[in-house]
């Protein structure tokens, strides 16, 4: 009986101590770009809005497009080898903020939420933007994305007036200063 209990305890400890293996990667191959297109489409479907005003299909066809290094970034998150999330950063011109970039397409699949992937992706994109010497990072999000807005505020973003036309009611616009001032971090990640 004692050996069974010890074996069960060892098995339980091994199962609970095995943390998921999370990896952030930059897509480089045709299959990785196809996976990026698929998860971007999943993201758009989850929003429940038509992104045609952002030329979404043209963006997908041209990947990496504006998200190409060195000024842009395109990230996929995997958990134990399974595609779990995505995010991107691109230069942003013709806005009222000098030397700006924009965080785009931050999305974590529902089955992988609660692991901190959204924070990891957002932090990695902000780190990239700082290394690329951007002054500010902008983003927009929707009214019903309360958890995302909470994350953005925790990362130092503040609400601002609209920086571009968005026909979707309830859009929120946020900005984070990148060239000075303290902001919370969760550790540095390399792209």
Model regions and ranges:
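Acetyl-CoA-dependent GNAT
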Residues: 22-110, 122-124, 128, 161-165, ...
